């Protein structure tokens, strides 16, 4: 078994057949998920005017577990600076990675960057990525606690995309896990890029006479249904004008 191999039933059986009782493994990161917003209500509640169900806590928690990381805590927090800072400070003490969805933009209630920078003693090194969706992303590191800090967009599809593109990728790099090879497919339509931004385009795959076709899944980054409908994504380079119908592209799976 090579370094970076995830131990599943077949791998465990192979080790047993060889009489190997113990093997060195990577300790999973401990992760805390915090979703911020006064508008968030529990998923078993009926949202009132100006309210939405708390999607990100559940979706991100599921993705954390799928990645093989240890979910320590997950909860929604109101847009109250003192309360949010208290929750983040508690999480930093116990976790290797903190994910905060929402509050990463530039509005009056968007206080995540300021709090993270204060807690980590100027540890925030990025506020804003040339990525669509995902522009308001915050990245930081607490040197004292050795904790990664991630401020994700509040929109569900954008939050999941940023987690996948940055933190799942980083975990695989640290542990030596090989990337899943992309699929080759042909675009079903012309699509313009976003000048100055790398675009993460959600697509669904369908079989055609000439091979796999990639059909864009259109929808706003706040619609989690777009992520559920997609089979993967195509990356459009920031210097690329766009994609043409029939153009061959690489489709990466989640």
Features from the language model and the residues they span:
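Generic structural signal for buried aliphatic residues
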Residues: 1-2, 7, 98, 243, ...
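Short, glycine/charged-enriched hinge/interface segments at domain edges or termini
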Residues: 1-73, 213, 218
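N-terminal small/polar loop signature for handling phosphorylated ligands or for N-terminal nucleophile
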Residues: 61-119
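A general structural motif
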Residues: 52-57, 78-84, 127-137
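Residue-level signal for inorganic ion chemistry
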Residues: 33, 64, 99, 203, ...
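A generic local secondary-structure boundary/capping motif
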Residues: 3-4, 19-25, 88-89, 127, ...
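Flexible glycine/proline-rich
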Residues: 115-254
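Short glycine-rich anion-binding loops that position phosphate/pyrophosphate groups of nucleotides
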Residues: 38-39, 103-106, 154
């Amino acid at each position: 078994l090579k370094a970076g191999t995830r131990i599943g039933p077949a791998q465990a059986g192979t080790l047993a057949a060889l009489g190997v009782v113990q093997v060195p493994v990577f300790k999973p990161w401990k992760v805390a998920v915090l979703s911020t917003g006064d508008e968030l209500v529990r998923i078993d509640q009926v949202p009132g005017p100006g309210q939405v169900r708390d999607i990100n806590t559940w979706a991100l928690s599921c993705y954390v577990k799928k990645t093989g990381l240890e979910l320590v805590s997950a909860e929604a927090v109101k847009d109250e600076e003192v309360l949010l800072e208290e929750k983040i400070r508690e999480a930093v003490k116990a976790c290797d990675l903190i994910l905060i969805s929402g509050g990463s933009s530039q509005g009056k209630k968007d206080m995540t960057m300021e709090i993270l920078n204060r807690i980590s003693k100027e540890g925030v090194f990025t506020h804003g990525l040339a990525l669509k969706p995902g522009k308001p992303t915050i990245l930081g590191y607490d040197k004292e606690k050795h904790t990664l800090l991630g401020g994700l967009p509040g929109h569900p599809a954008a939050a999941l995309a940023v987690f996948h593109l940055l933190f799942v990728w980083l975990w695989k790099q640290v542990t030596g896990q090989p990337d899943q090879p992309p699929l080759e497919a042909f675009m079903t339509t012309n699509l313009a890029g976003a000048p100055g931004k790398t675009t993460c385009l959600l697509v669904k795959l369908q079989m055609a006479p000439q091979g796999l076709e990639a059909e864009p899944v259109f929808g706003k980054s706040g619609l989690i249904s777009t992520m559920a409908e997609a089979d993967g994504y195509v990356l459009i380079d920031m210097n690329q004008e766009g994609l043409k119908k029939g153009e061959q592209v690489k489709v990466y799976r989640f």
